[in-house]
């Protein structure tokens, strides 16, 4: 079957390409379902991390690997004998990789998509559900001042969800194009370009009840902590190998440091509900919808010039 495969290159760099002879998964048996992929979405941060050998990456000796992703929209083509809720023809979002066929238990990390949901938008339900999970984990309250750092897909959707929870959101980035999209969506109360010395000029000490970091810029931890009030919350989401900050800075403020892991089915269901009602907008974040045959070009861009991409959906 076709899949997207991470491969090592002679110069120790990596590429991700479409291959046509990957082993097809066995099954379905028991309560498993088998789907044929319609769309899959790139998870920009995680998949780039894997391409550059980061903390989420397979080791060199494990290459090549197949699939490697968690945003898949597919149609059920077979069901196991114990399947009770899903049927052939159902269209699902699944936390599964870039592969032509997927086999997964029907009680796995998936949801059945209503007909009213655009399937291309659903191909980004993984990253957008991370945004849902993060806002819930941050325990945002009505009227709280929240700084969201990073206007990629997750940050943009987190701004929408946090605003829906009643928070007063400032969304910042150094990418003017992404900030323009945020302005067009209109969820954040303030959209701020912090390129150059913008952070020092615009982000006041202790100005926020919570800071949510989707950017993962190395060495920025003290700046994030300085932006929260006494007993404020700092939520680290973007991938890091190590988190290093000045202990006395955090101690004096009695800060709370939080992380969260991925998302669950409840996050998916609530995200889907909000998208269906038009309360969360994904369409403005989709920049490229391309045949999966163009994967190498897309992943070379993700590896080398990641800011050129935003939402990318592969058509299978």
Question: Positions of the model-derived regions?
Answer:
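C-terminal hydrophobic helical "lid"/dimerization subdomain
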Residues: 222, 265-316
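Glycine-rich phosphate-binding loop and adjacent beta-alpha segment
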Residues: 218-279, 316
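Mid-domain Rossmann-like dinucleotide-binding core that forms the NAD(H)/NADP(H) cofactor-binding site
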Residues: 118-194
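Glycine-rich beta-strand-centered segment in the early N-terminal region that forms part
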Residues: 25-42, 54-96
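A structural motif shared across PLP-dependent enzymes of the aminotransferase-like
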Residues: 44, 95-107
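N-terminal Rossmann-like NAD(P) cofactor-binding module of classical short-chain dehydrogenase/reductase
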Residues: 93, 212, 235
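A short acidic, Gly/Pro-enriched loop at the edge of an enzyme's catalytic core
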Residues: 201-211
């Amino acid at each position: 079957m076709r899949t997207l495969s991470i491969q090592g290159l002679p110069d120790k760099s990596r590429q991700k390409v479409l291959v046509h002879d990957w082993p097809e998964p066995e099954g379905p048996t028991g309560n498993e379902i088998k789907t044929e992929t319609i769309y899959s979405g790139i998870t920009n941060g995680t998949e780039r991390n894997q391409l550059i050998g980061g903390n989420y990456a397979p080791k060199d000796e494990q290459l090549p690997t197949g699939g490697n992703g968690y945003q898949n929209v597919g149609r059920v083509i077979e069901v196991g004998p114990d399947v009770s809720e899903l049927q052939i023809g159902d269209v699902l979002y699944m936390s599964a990789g870039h592969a032509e066929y997927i086999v997964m238990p029907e009680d796995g990390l998936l949801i059945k998509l209503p007909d009213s949901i655009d399937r291309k938008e659903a191909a980004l339900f993984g990253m957008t559900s991370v945004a849902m999970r993060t806002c819930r984990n941050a325990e945002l309250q009505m009227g709280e001042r929240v700084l969201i750092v990073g206007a990629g897909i997750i940050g943009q959707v987190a701004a929408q969800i946090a605003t829906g929870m009643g928070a007063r959101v400032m969304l910042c980035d150094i990418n003017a194009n992404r900030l323009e999209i945020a302005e067009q969506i209109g969820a954040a109360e303030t959209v701020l370009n912090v390129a150059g010395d913008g952070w020092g000029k615009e982000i006041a000490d202790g100005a926020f009840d919570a800071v949510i970091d989707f950017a993962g810029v190395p060495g920025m931890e003290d700046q994030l902590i300085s932006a929260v009030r006494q007993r404020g919350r700092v939520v680290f989401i973007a991938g890091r190998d190590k988190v290093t900050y000045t202990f006395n800075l955090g101690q004096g403020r009695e800060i709370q440091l939080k992380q969260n892991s991925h998302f669950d089915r409840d996050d998916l269901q609530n995200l889907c509900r909000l998208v269906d009602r038009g309360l969360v907008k994904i369409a403005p974040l989709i920049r490229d919808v391309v045949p999966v045959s163009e994967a190498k070009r897309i992943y070379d861009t993700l590896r080398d010039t990641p800011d050129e991409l935003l939402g990318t959906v592969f058509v299978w």
